[in-house]
């Protein structure tokens, strides 16, 4: 009977601490379901499809895009995203070399379960129309230019450092008979040849029920989940979707020889304006990912060898006066076999040749293992795993269950071994030195490797520009006017088909989620008198019994945890602007510096680091002054603060405070250590200058903020000159530099500049307040007449930069084949501004998947991404267009749509407005997704912004009340100025091929357009290779 055919048989049930991992299979179809109950507000789901390809056409990647564009039951593009919005949910997808994951999340169970069958239909029975292929994958427009969302995304991969390196590594490490050899994203040259028929064939081959697993994490009712999954199986059977008897499961071929017969060394070039630094990568083929114990041991050894300032690789290559690279690390890709990879980032060119031999020699000559440090590291690794289970259980279990589905037994036999990390950690604690040396010898010394050296090349960028221009001219001549006209008409019709208006009844049939059903996590908060009005709860009563000689600013958030997170936030407003640029060096320096731990003789930095790592689970010293690509979120802040965050076990609470004190107040200045830090940071800058994600916010930082702001002082474009000067001064007169750093530290050690946040089981902490006295009493200066400082970037904003005539700067980016654009306008400066709900709603509306802007920009292949971002902390609004083949047309199309919405020519759908409001519920549910997230958000609201703890929930009610008229008025005030030639500031990072055309187009729009190189913007000369390092001679 059908009912029997739709049932599920449990094949696995495993327990890890408080988590139970369950997995079931439907025998009639092979469709499987896995579930882990996690204490999170949001439910996460993923349909995982094991995908293998033996060409560079990109079928796995294109399907990831096309499956969203209509299905058999819901045959119109956009219905899936409309339903997801009404469920307070998000949908996404990603493609790796061995699987494609279709991801969804929702703020409450009912909406999540209603969305699952809709998503499943799109995955199992997609339309895969010619029109969707045209706009989403590849097309030639009426100007003869190549475009398409997938094509634009993959275009940059042909010349960027990371992509050309991985491309060479992949084709050198694996034989052509392996699916790992190929680019599943699709090479642009191959995407030109791809057809929708080929994609349909690939879907039929791979997207069979037995090759799909639904993984769900969160507070899910498993009975309801299985009932929903049975409904999906019923549809599978009714539609005759079967796994053919002759079907071959991906990645199960045993005919591939993965042996690397001899060491391989290859060199590749990538596009870059600066030719100062490159990268070196090594790879070995390891054991099967299903050999979980060996893989865990290899990962442990790799991290032990590289992930610390006192690790062998760190000491040899990074933590020296003249470093070989800015960062060195291992990564193990979980495949069959695994790929064990070693990366050296930002390597000065004069040090790049022979670096791989140094690395291989270090591995071969390792005859001893520091077993004391290994013992400490295994304890730390166990604690880190436990903290990840607390903070990020969904992502951890998703990774394991995905691996199990792609490679493991379909009867669940491999799953128990993949979940035994804590047991493996315990077993490794029993290993002797000879066991680690044996592992090292087998997989790194006696095992052949592949090395790829990636070198920067400005000539390559120029050649690409020339080749693209020649191809375009050739294409135009070949097609002729009539051919181009036909292509333009084809694209137009495809867009019209993809953007057909959805039925009102169809959209409304999927009811909107009830916000009252959303579960938000909340901590129990208490605080000292300096931090604000006390709360009325048992935690407040408990901390009030602890008498402190000082009145520190501390907020406590009580949650059920075996660990304690200590965070110290330091307001930097008292530091003179002349010293603020040094903060980046200070933050990195104190993580691994000599210190006065006792007495007057400094403890060497390597001993300090060893003790620190022994006593703590994690350490993070950070400055969060920027967000990549100007993608600011309205709720973010802390841009003018230095933070020191330490996580410890509960019994080490006092040690956590002790280490914050040592890092902040007891580190001592050492010339060699400081030079090492400076040179590491200098080596990173060429890499950052090749990436628009760094350059875009950096440009606005130096234009919109004065030199008192960290945004101005610490961004990529400002730091290069500062670091060069600091390096020169340190070599010639280090005492004056040490005096400057000490002076800067004294400004930070002001009682009123420090705010403290403690998260954990507060009721089990002895002396929760007075423990901090050793830091605050003995090290901090107190001014009784001074209030606690509260500084935001908006305090340093230069509003005059938004002049009467718009300034648009075009920055040539040889490393990119596409362009990025950001426009900025004055924004609001308070989280209580009555306009904020309207602005957030507008930003949500602009970003709706398959909404009007999505269809106009991404749906037309004009850009891969776009968004409106809100920086309340900095007082600025941004409109961003990312990875665009035609940035002017993307901007102009956005402008035309905004004007049409304001005029009423294009109607604002009530359903889209509802979905935009639901996005805000999704955002807040993510901010309070679990107890730790909720605690951090509580501190931000109460102790940074000075708001009430329930302010986010009040804000949701305000968003809910925004009317259509308020929305339209908001578009005029807060969106239309992005498209004016006055009162805004803009920057474009342009591919070389598009500069002239872009300048001409925006000039015609009335903009004052300037083309400036990065060196011109920075006001510095290009540095010669001889100047890049301190040491010159490289004989070590």
From Swiss-Prot:
GO terms for biological process: mitochondrial protein catabolic process. InterPro entries: Metalloenz_LuxS/M16 (IPR011249), Pept_M16_N (IPR011765), Peptidase_M16_C (IPR007863). Gene3D superfamilies: Metalloenzyme, LuxS/M16 peptidase-like. Transmembrane segments: none annotated. One of its GO terms (cellular component) is mitochondrial matrix. GO terms for molecular function: metal ion binding; metalloendopeptidase activity. It holds the Pfam family Peptidase_M16_C. This is Uncharacterized protein C3H1.02c.
């Amino acid at each position: 009977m059908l009912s029997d055919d739709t049932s599920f048989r449990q094949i696995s049930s495993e327990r890890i601490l408080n988590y139970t991992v369950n997995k079931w299979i439907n025998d009639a179809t092979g469709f499987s379901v896995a579930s882990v109950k996690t204490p999170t507000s949001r439910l996460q789901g993923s349909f995982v499809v094991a995908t293998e390809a033996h060409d560079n056409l990109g079928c796995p990647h294109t399907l990831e895009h096309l499956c969203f564009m209509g299905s058999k039951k819901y045959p119109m593009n956009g219905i899936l995203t409309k339903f997801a919005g009404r469920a307070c949910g998000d949908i996404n997808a990603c493609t790796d070399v061995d699987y494609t994951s279709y991801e969804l999340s929702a703020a409450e169970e009912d909406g999540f379960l209603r969305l699952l069958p809709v998503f499943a239909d799109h995955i199992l029975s997609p339309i895969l129309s010619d029109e969707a292929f045209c706009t989403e994958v590849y097309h030639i427009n009426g100007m003869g230019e190549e475009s398409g969302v997938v094509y634009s995304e993959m275009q940059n991969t042909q010349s960027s450092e990371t992509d050309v390196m991985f491309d060479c590594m992949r084709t050198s490490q694996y034989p052509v008979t392996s699916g790992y050899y190929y680019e599943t994203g699709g090479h642009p040259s191959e995407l030109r040849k791809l057809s929708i028929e080929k994609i349909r064939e690939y879907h039929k081959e791979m997207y069979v029920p037995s090759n799909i697993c639904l993984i769900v994490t969160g507070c899910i009712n498993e009975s309801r989940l299985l009932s929903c999954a049975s409904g999906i199986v019923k549809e599978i059977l009714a539609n005759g979707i079967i796994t053919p008897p002759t079907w071959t499961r991906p990645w199960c071929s045993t005919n591939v020889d993965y042996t690397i017969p001899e060491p391989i060394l290859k060199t590749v070039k990538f596009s870059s304006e600066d030719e100062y630094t490159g990268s070196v990568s090594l790879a070995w083929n390891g054991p099967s990912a299903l050999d979980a114990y060996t893989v865990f041991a290899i990962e442990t050894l790799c991290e032990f060898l590289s992930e610390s300032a006192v690790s062998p690789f760190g000491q040899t290559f990074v933590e020296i006066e003249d470093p070989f690279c800015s960062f060195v690390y291992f990564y193990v890709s979980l495949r069959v076999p695994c790929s064990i990879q070693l990366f050296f980032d930002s390597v000065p060119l004069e040090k790049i040749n022979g670096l791989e031999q140094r690395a291989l020699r270090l591995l071969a000559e390792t005859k001893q293992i520091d077993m004391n440090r290994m013992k400490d590291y295994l304890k730390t690794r166990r604690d880190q795993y436990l903290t990840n289970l607390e903070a990020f259980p969904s992502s951890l279990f998703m990774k394991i269950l995905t691996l199990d589905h792609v490679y493991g037994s379909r009867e669940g036999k491999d799953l128990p071994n993949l979940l035994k990390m804590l047991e493996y950690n315990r077993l490794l604690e029993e290993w002797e030195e000879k066991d680690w040396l044996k592992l090292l010898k087998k997989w790194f010394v006696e095992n052949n490797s592949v090395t790829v050296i990636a070198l920067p090349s400005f000539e390559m960028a120029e050649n690409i520009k020339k080749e693209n221009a020649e191809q375009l001219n050739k294409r135009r001549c070949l097609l002729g006017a009539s051919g181009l006209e036909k292509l333009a008409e084809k694209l137009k019709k495809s867009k019209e088909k993809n953007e057909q208006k959805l039925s009102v009844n169809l959209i409304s049939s999927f009811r909107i989620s009830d916000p009252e059903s959303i579960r938000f996590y909340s901590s129990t908060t208490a605080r000292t008198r300096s931090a604000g009005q006390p709360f009325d709860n048992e935690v407040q009563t408990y901390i009030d019994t602890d008498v402190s000689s000082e009145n520190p600013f501390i907020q406590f958030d009580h949650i059920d945890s075996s660990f304690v997170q200590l965070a110290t936030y330091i307001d930097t407003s008292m530091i003179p602007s002349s010293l603020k640029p040094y903060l980046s060096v200070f933050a990195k320096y104190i993580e691994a510096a000599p210190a006065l731990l006792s007495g007057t003789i400094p403890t060497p930095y390597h001993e300090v680091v060893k003790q620190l790592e022994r006593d703590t689970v994690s350490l993070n010293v950070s400055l969060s002054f920027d967000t990549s690509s100007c993608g600011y979120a309205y709720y973010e802040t802390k841009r003018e603060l230095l933070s020191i965050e330490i996580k410890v076990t509960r019994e080490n609470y006092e040690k956590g405070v002790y280490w914050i004190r040592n890092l902040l107040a007891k580190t001592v200045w050492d010339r060699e250590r400081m030079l090492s830090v400076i040179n590491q940071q200098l080596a990173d800058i060429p890499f950052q200058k090749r990436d628009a994600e760094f350059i875009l916010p950096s440009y606005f930082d130096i234009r919109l903020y004065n030199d008192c702001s960290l945004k101005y002082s610490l961004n990529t474009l400002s730091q290069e000159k500062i670091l060069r000067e600091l390096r020169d001064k340190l070599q010639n007169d280090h005492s004056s530099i040490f005096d400057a750093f000490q002076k800067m530290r004294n400004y930070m050690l002001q009682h009123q500049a420090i705010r403290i946040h403690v998260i954990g089981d507060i009721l089990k902490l002895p002396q929760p307040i007075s423990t901090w006295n050793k830091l605050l009493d003995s090290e901090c200066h107190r001014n009784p007449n001074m209030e606690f400082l509260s500084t935001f970037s908006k305090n340093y904003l230069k509003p005059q930069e938004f002049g009467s005539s718009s300034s648009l700067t075009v920055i040539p980016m040889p490393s990119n084949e596409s362009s990025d654009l950001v426009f900025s306008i004055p924004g609001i400066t308070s989280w209580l501004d009555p306009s904020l709900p309207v602005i957030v709603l507008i930003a949500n509306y602009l970003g709706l998947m398959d909404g009007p802007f999505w269809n106009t920009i991404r749906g037309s292949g004009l850009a891969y991404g776009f968004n409106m971002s809100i920086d309340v902390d900095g007082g600025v609004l941004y409109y961003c267009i990312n990875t665009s083949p035609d940035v002017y047309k993307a901007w102009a199309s956005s402008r035309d749509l905004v004007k049409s919405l304001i005029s009423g020519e294009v109607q604002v759908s009530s359903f889209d407005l509802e979905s935009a409001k639901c996005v805000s519920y999704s955002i807040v549910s993510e901010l309070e997704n679990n107890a730790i997230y909720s605690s951090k958000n509580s501190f931000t609201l109460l102790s940074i912004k000075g708001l009430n703890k329930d302010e986010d929930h009040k804000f949701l009610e305000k968003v809910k009340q925004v009317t259509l008229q308020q929305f339209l008025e908001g578009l005029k005030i807060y969106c239309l100025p992005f498209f004016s030639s006055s009162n805004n500031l803009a920057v474009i990072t342009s591919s070389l091929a598009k500069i002239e055309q872009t300048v001409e187009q925006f000039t015609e729009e009335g903009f004052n357009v300037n083309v400036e190189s990065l060196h011109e913007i920075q006001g510095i000369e290009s540095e010669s290779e001889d100047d890049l390092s301190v040491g010159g001679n490289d004989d070590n």
